[in-house]
């Protein structure tokens, strides 16, 4: 097995852990993404002013709680999402969530590259293929340097996006008559509140399932909860507000489009580039960790390979794969639910990653994911929340029953090895 400073095959040592501020910037860099603005635009034009804020705050609170669980587990153990999955899915069984998580992140990376290149190409007249090649290369080179590079990039990007985007929103709202005029807007096609909540939670629950990949570098597990809450409850909410304000004022959800319409071309390119760069690098970093769990290769090398694939296929992914990626992403929330459920039941096993005896494949975990997907699809309520709870509850109920002998045997062996 190849080792690298991404610690893709074992826990992050205390000497490599980082402070809460650095991780907060990294996680905000993940959640500052154009797709959340687009969803915010949909909500802003489909809900009243007060219902919009209620949906955004409740939805992102639920998202924050979910990611906080995963962040706590990641920081407590120092393990990636994929190594955590070994405890519940089995060593080879964890390849399934790793393939699902890693594959979707490569896909979204390619989509993100195209999301930058296409509007910039239209605004400047530059060749879109050239923009894709250059931006994809820059993003791929950055991720090669691991969590430290992600931190530096996010420290630059997060304040820039917040300040420039905030200024643009202020101009847009003032241009339509101020906050009172914004409050007075009546939705032409009202959106059901439960659908709105599902859109908010669903906007980032796929990437949120990978929270442990980043927060495992935290020195304190309790502070990891704070990091996840700030990123998803505050950071994601800000993107929704940007999108809603832009859509209400100028009919454009992406803040970079609003800025171009305002004549702020260079700031728009900066905001769009940094916005996508930070999220894409996090996606590429996480994809490398996923495929490292399957292959045992260096996650650095795999991230670079994934970046090249995503860049080459960017336009095709953008034009043909978004619907498929969205479908695949619906299968991801139950994976997080199963990981959380197993940790709650067997947290002492997680203290000894190197010596813990694990199953090859735990079919109960895979069944629980399938039941979680079914719960999300068929049960009334908030789809991604139902999927997480369906996966977690199915695992909590079925695993002790169907794996009683196996669990007892592993617990006995581990108890003897600790003694």
UniProtKB/Swiss-Prot annotation:
It is a multi-pass membrane protein. It is found in: Cell inner membrane. Residues 1-19, 72-100, 148-152, 213-221, 278-300, 342-358, 401-419 are cytoplasmic. The chain crosses the membrane at residues 20-39, 52-71, 101-120, 128-147, 153-172, 193-212, 222-242, 258-277, 301-320, 322-341, 359-378, 381-400. One of its GO terms (cellular component) is plasma membrane. One of its GO terms (biological process) is cytosine metabolic process. Keywords: Cell inner membrane, Cell membrane, Cytosine metabolism, Membrane, Transmembrane, Transmembrane helix, Transport. One of its GO terms (molecular function) is cytosine transmembrane transporter activity. Its main location: membrane. Pfam families: Transp_cyt_pur (PF02133). Residues 40-51, 121-127, 173-192, 243-257, 321, 379-380 are periplasmic. Belongs to the purine-cytosine permease (2.A.39) family. NCBIfam families: PRK11017.1 (NF008241). This is Cytosine permease. The gene is codB.
């Amino acid at each position: 097995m190849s080792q690298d400073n991404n610690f893709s095959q074992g826990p992050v040592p205390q000497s490599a852990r980082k402070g809460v501020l650095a991780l907060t910037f990294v996680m905000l860099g993940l959640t500052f993404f154009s797709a959340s603005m687009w969803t915010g635009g949909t909500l802003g034009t489909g809900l009243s002013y007060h219902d919009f804020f209620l949906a955004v705050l409740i939805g992102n609170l639920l998202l924050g709680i979910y990611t906080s669980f995963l962040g706590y587990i990641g920081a407590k153990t120092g393990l990636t999402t994929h190594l955590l999955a070994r405890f519940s899915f089995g060593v080879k069984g964890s390849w399934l969530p790793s393939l699902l998580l890693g594959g979707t992140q490569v896909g979204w990376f390619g989509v993100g590259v195209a999301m930058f290149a296409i509007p910039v190409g239209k605004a400047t007249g530059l060749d879109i293929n050239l923009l894709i090649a250059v931006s994809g290369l820059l993003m791929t080179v950055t991720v090669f340097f691991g969590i430290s590079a992600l931190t530096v990039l996010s420290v630059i990007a997060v304040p820039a996006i917040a300040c420039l985007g905030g200024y643009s929103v202020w101009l847009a709202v003032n241009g339509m008559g101020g906050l009172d005029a914004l409050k007075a807007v009546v939705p032409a096609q009202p959106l059901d509140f439960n659908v709105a909540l599902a859109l908010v939670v669903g906007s980032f629950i796929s990437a949120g399932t990978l929270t442990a990949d980043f927060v495992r570098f935290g020195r304190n597990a309790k502070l990891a909860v704070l990091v996840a809450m700030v990123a998803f409850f505050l950071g994601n909410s800000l993107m929704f507000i940007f999108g809603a304000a832009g859509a209400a004022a100028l009919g454009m959800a992406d803040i970079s489009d609003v800025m171009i319409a305002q004549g702020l071309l260079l700031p728009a390119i900066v905001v769009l580039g940094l916005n996508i760069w930070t999220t894409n690098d996090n996606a590429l970093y996480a994809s490398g960790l996923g495929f490292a769990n399957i292959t045992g290769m260096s996650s650095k090398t795999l991230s670079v390979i994934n970046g090249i694939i995503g860049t080459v296929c960017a336009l095709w992914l953008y034009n043909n794969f978004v619907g498929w990626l969205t479908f695949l992403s619906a299968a991801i929330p139950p994976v997080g639910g199963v990981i959380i459920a197993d940790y709650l039941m067997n947290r002492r096993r997680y203290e000894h990653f190197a010596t813990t005896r694990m199953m090859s494949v735990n079919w109960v975990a895979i069944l629980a994911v399938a039941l979680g997907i079914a719960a999300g699809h068929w049960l009334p309520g908030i789809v991604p929340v139902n999927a997480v709870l369906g996966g977690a509850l199915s695992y909590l109920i079925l695993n002790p029953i169907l794996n009683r002998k196996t669990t007892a045997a592993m617990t006995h062996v581990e108890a003897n090895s600790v003694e």
